[in-house]
Each structure stands twice: as structure tokens, then as C-alpha cells.
A protein has these predicted regions:
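N-terminal accessory nucleic-acid engagement/regulatory domains that precede
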Residues: 1-49
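P-loop NTPase motor domains
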Residues: 32-38, 70, 74, 78-380, ...
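N-terminal pre-Walker A segment at the start of P-loop NTPase domains
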Residues: 47-76
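Conserved P-loop NTPase motor module
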Residues: 439, 443-566, 573, 619-623, ...
Length: 682
């Protein structure tokens, strides 16, 4: 029995030891063995479902990219089907905004028969690419009427010429350009609209633009002429502007803020009101800007008509160059170009057009928010590039910046930091993630459970840590072309077909040969591939640009000389109307029955008729008023004392048959014969 008991005891001990070892093994395996559920959690949380199907339409833009999802790398496609709902590409310098997104978009839309406007901040980088796509398109479609245009302030031998202000004819357009010019000069202007001095500067600039638009058929209306005119002393300009406003009611409205100061001859006050319209104008005097933004008879064949960019009959690809070294000067010039283009494009029934503005905050596009809001109905694909939301707020103001950002439907994001990254991460929403967890029971069994929870689809840290060429974003779809997976995160694949590479090498080699013949160095990032339209030496360029500036200054001077002659007569008429001298009009109105006082009326009428007659020399645009209608407007402008006096003047004209200049001169001669010439010496 003792032996049996010992045996049983030993057996029990062995069984207990085995059980203990088995239990310990399970615990060790649970805590120390590689955790498959953790690996599975990482796999399940890796990325999110994205589009792997290429969806092309006649107006789509498509990018190939690779992305990670559940531990595997996939090839996907960013299918931008709603190109008319605007796009922005945001990212710090070096993220690949242009190379990854803007350049492929330009290539594809040009191939799909779009017109295009391209703001090339680092001229001629994008311009060379557009020209390459233009050449490729023309080879594929030799009968096409598509044209190419290039405006550059640094490559004068290659540049076309274009006056963006040509054709402005309404006060609304003049005000719009005034805002554009002043905001380009001072980005804080947009936030100060409504303030007294800001509104005065805006009205004054608008009046000058309007006046140049109506004088001499508008042929002196350009940005260089406007800047030259604005640099004049206000006391010289105001009599001229006041006189012209007599015949144009909408211009008269613009003049109203200055009327009291002008009527009371408090011109120093006017100078204070207009200081912000003149600050910085000296630095805007640039000869290359003046050359590109004006036209002459010799340049008609290379003059760009902005109104024809989106023409169905002869659409155009227009590249607008800039240069970081001339930021302020060219920012103003390009602001005027892009604002005008945006207004002209935004109409129905035109050719589909792409509007590319990389580094858009380096200029100011007045009405950009409206262009984006209405682009879909007018078939305009807007693509904007910038570095950070704070830039937009700084240069466009909070309200306009919010309107731009919140109405753009297609968003492409490279690496950005801080608040911008946080806001964008939140905008991409959350994703559902399955999480596997396991536990061990008291009896040693391991149980596994699966739960779902929400995580940010794209986190702030993901955006901040994106590598070059990596982007996140969201695209919009169209009715009937719905896209399930709108958000993407991956590395864009930019492929260059062999045919495209051969064309690139052909254009580059041709340019290198031209540089060699001309004794110039070929600089890959600075030399345009675009053919020359003139072949001037550096000295000849300087001479031509200088002569053009002199021509502009002389034209403005001649305009002012002609206007001042008439304005001097206008001053005399105003004095004869309100003054108390011997020959002033009030003496006649006080004693209309006194024969010797009639000369006051006749002298006044002679000066008024002379003004109306001489205004015909100004070749006023849309001059549809008769001599009598102009006289009536002039009369009501200078005589504001009483309605009775006004009627008295009109009746006296008829009574004495003094209805034109010749009849009044005859009446004055008769008066001199009767009373002696010594009485008539006003």
C-alpha cells in the first residue's frame, strides 16, 4: 500500500507539473510570442480604400499614383471629372505642385481642345511646357486654328504685346481696375475698402482710367499711361477731369467725393485724399512693363487680343510670365492682365478654357472668387497653386480668401504645416477601422474579439510629413459619374512618353542652336523655347524700351496740354458764372432789362460755346450728344444758383438768337459798335 501510495503521489505530482507547465506556456505565448493581432491591426489601419479604375471623359484630368492599403501597394487613379468646379494645389516649396499636378493638367486639357491662360511665376518654366504641348497639338491637328501667345517682361525678343485695358468703357470697369491697381500696390487695400481715404483713392484712380478711356477714342488708355497720369499733381488734373465728367454722368458720380474740395479750391485737402493712390507709383516705372503693356502699328501682328482667348473660331494658349526678382512691379502688371482676362472669359457660349495661376498670391486677381463661383456654368477650369492658407488671407483678405477656399471642390495637398495642415486634415473626415483584441480567461483560454471605431482618414502629422511628390486630397464628381472614393493619399506617378521626350529634346536643341548662333548662353531654367518675334541686341532692346517710355510720357503730356487749354476756358466760365467782376453773369441776371448788361450774357455764352466746340477736338468715345445737349449739361454744371436763373438764361438765348458761337460773336461785335470796345475786356 505504501508503494502504491507513493506511486500515486508521484503520478499526481507529475500531472500537476505538466498542467502548471502547460498553463505557463500559454501565458508565455500570450505575452511573449509575436502578436498576430497587433500586426493585423496595423494592416487594417493602413490607408483606406481608394480608386483603382481609370475614368476618362472629354473634359477630365487624370493622374496615376500609388497608394498603400492594408499592407499592400496599389496603383490608383485620381480622376478629376468636375474640372469646372475649380481646383487648388497647396504645398510648401519643393513639394512638386507644378510637376505633379499643374503640368499634367495643362498637357491633358490642351490635348482636349481647351483654350488656356497660364500665369508662369518662374518664367519661362511653365511657358516652355505649354509651348511644347502646343507644338504637339498642332502636329496632331494641323488644321486647327489654335494659337499661342507669350507675354514676358524679361524675354523681350520673344514676347508678344498686349494692352489689357483696351476697350474699358464703363465706370464699373474703371472702378474694378482701380481696385486691382491699388490692391496690387498695397495688399492691405482690400481690407480697408469703405474707409474715407481708401474710397477717395479708388474713385480718383477710376476717374483717371475712365477719362483715358473716353479721350481720343481711348487710344491712350493703358496701364503705363494711367500710372503716368496718376503721377501728375492733382491740381493739374482736376479741372480736366471735372470738365470731362460733365458729359458722362457715371464719371460725374465718381467725381462726387472731390466736388466740395474742388469747388472751394481746397486742393491741399485733395492731395491728402489721394496720397494712397500715388504711393508706390514711382517704383512701378518699368520700361519692359511699359513696352509689353502697350501696342503700336509695328506690333499689330504680335498683339494679343484678350477677348479672343476663348474664341471658338481661333482659341489661344496665352502664357503670362513673371519673375520673382521683379515681384512688386510685375505683380501689378499681372494683376491687371489676370483681372481683365477673368472678366472676359467669364461668359457663356465660349470655348472651354483652363485658367492656371501657380503661386497665385504673388499677384492679385480682382473677382477671383466670382470666377470660381461661376466657372462651372461658363466652362472654365480654374487651377490655383499656393503654399499656405495664411498667404491667401494675407494677400486677399479673410472674406475673399474664405470665399475662394470654400468654393473650390477639388483639393490637392502636399506637405504643409501647422494650422493649414490641421484644417485640411479635419476636412478629409474619418474612416472606419476594425480593431482585433484578445484576452485570456481564468481557465487559460485565449479569446479574440473584433470592434470598429472611427479614426481620422488623414491626420495632421501625415500631411506635415508628406515627401516630395506625395499628396493627399479630395476630388468632386459629377451627376451620373459618381465616384465612390473621393479622398486619396499617395505618390503621384509622372510618366513621360518617348514621343513627348523626343519633342522636348527637339525644342531644347533648336533653342541651344539659336543661342549658339547669337553668342548667348543657354540656361535651362531661363531660356524660352518659344520662337523669337524680334531679333534685337541687348543695346537695341534698351534703346527701344526707352523710346517707348518717352513716347508714353509725350502722349500724356500732349493730352494734358490740349485738355488744359479747354480747362482754362472752363475755369474762366466758372468765374464768370459765380464771380462778382464787372462782366460776370450775375449782373445780367440781376438787370436783364438793362441793355448794357446784355454783354455779360453774350460773353458768358461765348466762353460756354467755345468749350463745347473745342471738346469736339477731344475725339470723345461714344460721343452721341448734340451741341445743344452738351451745352445744356455744361450750363447745369456751372450754374447751380436757382432754377429761375437757369430758365432766364435759356430764354435769353432764344430771345437774342444767340444759339451758337457765330451768332454770339456777331452780337458782341454789334454791342462793341454801339457802346464802344473799351467796355468789353473780361
Amino acid at each position: 500500500l505504501t508503494a502504491v501510495g507513493q506511486s500515486l503521489n508521484i503520478l499526481g505530482s507529475l500531472i500537476s507539473a505538466v498542467c502548471i507547465l502547460s498553463y505557463c506556456g500559454r501565458i508565455t505565448k500570450f505575452y511573449l510570442a509575436p502578436d498576430r493581432s497587433l500586426n493585423e491591426n496595423e494592416r487594417l489601419a493602413d490607408g483606406f480604400e481608394q480608386t483603382t479604375e481609370l475614368i476618362e471623359t472629354p473634359t477630365s484630368v487624370n493622374w496615376k499614383y500609388e497608394f498603400s492599403y492594408q499592407g499592400k501597394t496599389h496603383i490608383g487613379y485620381i480622376n478629376e471629372l468636375a474640372v469646372y468646379r475649380a481646383s487648388f494645389v497647396i504645398g510648401m516649396p519643393g513639394t512638386g505642385k507644378s510637376h505633379s499636378f499643374l503640368d499634367p493638367a495643362m498637357k491633358q486639357l490642351i490635348a482636349k481642345h481647351f483654350s488656356a491662360v497660364v500665369y508662369d511665376y518662374k518664367d519661362p518654366t511653365l511657358s516652355n511646357a505649354v509651348y511644347q504641348y502646343y507644338v504637339a497639338y498642332k502636329r496632331e491637328h494641323p488644321a486647327s486654328t489654335l494659337r499661342f501667345g507669350y507675354l514676358s517682361y524679361v524675354n523681350i525678343n520673344h514676347t508678344y504685346r498686349c494692352n489689357p485695358m483696351k476697350g474699358i468703357s464703363t465706370s464699373a470697369e474703371a472702378v474694378n481696375f482701380a481696385i486691382t491697381i491699388l490692391t496690387a500696390l498695397n495688399k492691405n487695400f482690400v481690407e480697408k475698402q469703405g474707409e474715407f481715404f481708401t474710397e477717395s483713392a479708388k474713385s480718383y484712380t477710376a476717374i483717371v482710367i475712365y477719362a483715358l478711356g473716353v479721350l481720343f477714342g481711348g487710344r491712350y488708355l493703358s496701364l503705363p499711361h494711367t500710372l503716368t497720369m496718376l503721377s501728375q499733381v492733382p491740381s493739374v488734373l482736376f479741372p480736366v477731369l471735372k470738365l470731362i465728367s460733365v458729359l458722362y454722368p457715371d464719371m460725374k458720380t465718381l467725381f462726387s467725393p472731390f466736388k466740395e474740395a474742388y469747388d472751394t479750391n481746397t486742393l491741399p485737402q485733395l492731395q491728402g485724399q489721394l496720397a494712397s493712390a500715388q504711393i508706390g507709383l514711382g517704383s512701378m516705372s518699368d520700361a519692359s512693363l511699359a513696352y509689353v503693356m502697350t501696342e503700336d502699328e509695328e506690333s499689330r501682328d504680335i498683339a494679343v487680343d484678350l477677348d479672343t482667348i476663348s474664341s471658338k473660331e481661333s482659341p489661344m494658349l496665352l502664357c503670362l510670365g513673371s519673375n520673382p526678382r521683379l515681384g512688386a512691379v510685375l505683380g501689378l502688371a499681372n494683376a491687371v492682365y489676370l483681372t481683365r482676362i477673368a472678366n472676359l472669359l467669364n461668359r457663356k457660349g465660349r470655348n472651354p478654357t483652363a485658367f492656371f495661376a501657380d503661386e497665385v498670391v504673388t499677384t492679385y486677381i480682382n473677382g477671383l472668387d466670382n470666377l470660381i463661383a461661376t466657372a462651372r456654368s461658363n466652362k472654365i477650369a480654374v487651377f490655383l497653386g499656393f503654399q499656405d492658407f495664411s498667404q491667401m488671407v494675407r494677400d486677399y483678405g479673410q472674406k475673399i480668401s474664405d470665399a475662394i477656399v470654400n468654393t473650390v471642390n477639388n483639393v490637392f495637398v502636399g506637405a504643409v504645416k501647422g494650422k493649414t495642415a490641421k484644417e485640411l486634415a479635419e476636412s478629409f473626415g474619418k474612416k472606419t477601422v476594425k480593431k482585433i483584441s484578445k484576452s485570456i480567461t481564468e481557465d487559460g483560454k485565449v479569446t479574440t474579439s473584433i470592434a470598429e471605431h472611427k479614426e481620422e482618414r488623414i491626420t495632421q502629422s501625415m500631411i506635415e510629413e508628406l515627401s516630395q511628390g506625395e499628396f493627399v486630397g479630395r476630388i468632386a464628381d459629377e451627376y451620373g459619374k459618381e465616384i465612390k472614393c473621393k479622398v486619396f493619399h499617395g505618390k503621384v506617378i509622372v510618366e513621360t512618353p518617348e514621343k513627348e521626350q523626343r519633342l522636348r529634346e527637339e525644342l531644347e536643341n533648336r533653342t541651344k542652336n539659336e543661342c549658339e548662333r547669337d553668342g548667348r548662353s543657354y540656361l535651362p531654367d531661363e531660356t524660352p523655347w518659344i520662337p523669337k518675334v524680334r531679333n534685337w541686341s541687348d543695346e537695341e532692346i534698351k534703346r527701344r524700351l526707352r523710346l517707348n517710355v518717352i513716347k508714353i510720357n509725350n502722349e500724356v503730356s500732349d493730352v494734358l496740354l490740349k485738355l488744359n487749354e479747354i480747362a482754362d476756358t472752363y475755369k474762366i466760365l466758372t468765374h464768370l458764372t459765380t464771380g462778382t467782376d464787372e462782366f460776370c453773369l450775375r449782373h445780367y441776371l440781376a438787370e436783364p432789362q438793362n441793355p448794357q448788361k446784355r454783354i455779360n450774357l453774350f460773353v458768358w455764352l461765348e466762353e460756354a460755346y467755345r468749350i463745347v466746340w473745342r471738346m469736339g477736338e477731344l475725339e470723345l468715345k461714344d460721343d452721341i450728344l448734340s451741341f445743344e445737349e452738351k451745352f445744356q449739361l455744361l450750363l447745369r454744371d456751372v450754374y447751380t444758383t436757382s432754377y429761375e436763373g437757369l430758365q432766364q438764361i435759356l430764354k435769353a438765348r432764344e430771345q437774342y438768337h444767340a444759339m451758337d458761337l457765330n451768332s454770339v460773336k456777331q452780337l458782341i461785335d454789334e454791342y462793341e459798335d454801339e457802346y464802344g470796345t473799351n467796355l468789353v475786356n473780361p
